[in-house]
Amino acid sequence: MISKINGKLFADMIIQGAQNLSNNADLVDSLNVYPVPDGDTGTNMNLTMTSGREEVENNLSKNIGELGKTFSKGLLMGARGNSGVILSQLFRGFCKNIESESEINSKLLAESFQAGVETAYKAVMKPVEGTILTVAKDAAQAAIEKANNTEDCIELMEYIIVKANESLENTPNLLAVLKEVGVVDSGGKGLLCVYEGFLKALKGEKVEAKVAKLDKDEFVHDEHDFHGVINTEDIIYGYCTEMMVRFGKNKKAFDEQEFRQDMSQFGDSLLVINDEEIVKVHVHTEYPGKVFNYGQQYGELIKLKVENMREQHREVIRKEQHTAKPKMETVETAIITISMGEGISEIFKSMGATHIISGGQTMNPSTEDIVKVIEQSKCKRAIILPNNKNILMASEQAASIVDAEAVVIPTKSIPQGISALFQYDVDATLEENKAQMADSVNNVKSGSLTYAVRDTKIDGVEIKKDAFMGLIEDKIVSSQSDQLTTVTELLNEMLADDSEILTVIIGQDAEQAVTDNMINWIEEQYPDVEVEVHEGGQPIYQYFFSVE
């Protein structure tokens, strides 16, 4: 029985919850409704939870209130994607409820889950049932009921998991698209994974990391970033040190947590990856020999590498002395756009964007990524263009915590971002620009072409794995094995008699022959439509389209 949870135990709950989510991230990704190759829910929740875990591991406290503040900060700044932001808000409310406590009982644990739900619902502009919010709400309500007749936090957590699982299984009955595709909600599944890890910790058990076979021929390719290091002497740990150790039968038994703790004493930038046979280590240290000696306790050293980072920094300085380096741009009003592909970034820059953050479907920038750009620009005002529905909440979260006056234009696609930026008026106020830029989003129809990562049926369209898919906004309107056929079906849905301009943004995987045939087809079928073609260089999507 566990009647009280202190900071030490809560830290272990967080660590085991994060590990269980990490182990199941691919499974959560596979539950995404749309078969586009982004797999964002599991990935984003995992990265968000990992950020919280790392903050906790670096700032351990026996006081649960203090630890909760640390955890909440890590989640807030590391939140990626809408699922990650919602996860961060669930635990923001949870941790706020325990901030004055040194330890909590089952009743306060239940109340904190409920406080998290209330915070998360307030953070979402239009809450949708049948999602992670529903699973969290049902689990919290069950916790409140159960806490009335048990003081055992283990028993409470077991009941929470039972009810969360029941809620998860019911999500297809609340959200029609889940039922059509035949899956449960991916975010709800991710949350359940975290709760299951919590229970493991309460029982004194450990979630083992998934074992993956390691490539014994490859080291970590560490490109050292010296931004912010002015003098070579400022580098505290001067040697980038890497080793591979093959475990020996008569050597010390390998325990990853103990290994990490011991290795962390030698320096920073620690990375440890292991399987049943070997462990790979990367660390920045002053004493490479001590690292190697420590590794020999566990087995045979099979590969070693040491690089002198101070010498590398001296070389960087020598090169920079011969190359004019532009200063980081500071502006009164920062226009920050999220972009994918060099060509698209150049389009945004040419239209007046002051700062570009690389990101998109496969890698949503975190709240912290956006905050850093705003802070480094030293701007008084900031306009953020997410250009992706899954980056919208992280953008809003960033805007809410910076000192600058910041607004988010709700652009959900690259074409919408371009249209909004076209409306920016340097002489207008921030609120005037926000209004006219947001209004322009409604005047553009966005489309895209990509491929399917699995078989499914959605929006009444049969989709086969690896087939091409044409989407208008988020709706799949065409899917064929032939790329040109899919494109023409998509454009027939997008174009109308009153369409004036069609913009085509070409991705890095587009084939020139398909592009040429597509342009010829457009000119034949829609001779009155003006066609603008740009090289975008975006991954995942062969084409982006916009119609005005």
Swiss-Prot record:
UniProt xrefs under SUPFAM superfamilies: DhaL-like (SSF101473)
Superkingdom of the source species: Bacteria
Residue intervals of the DhaL domain: 8-200
Molecular function GO terms recorded: glycerone kinase activity
InterPro entries tied to this protein: DegV_domain_contain (IPR050270), DhaL_dom (IPR004007), DhaL_dom_sf (IPR036117), FakA-like_C (IPR033470), FakA-like_M (IPR048394), YloV-like (IPR019986)
Example GO biological process: glycerol metabolic process
Name recorded for this polypeptide: Uncharacterized protein SAR1202
Biological source species: Staphylococcus aureus (strain MRSA252)
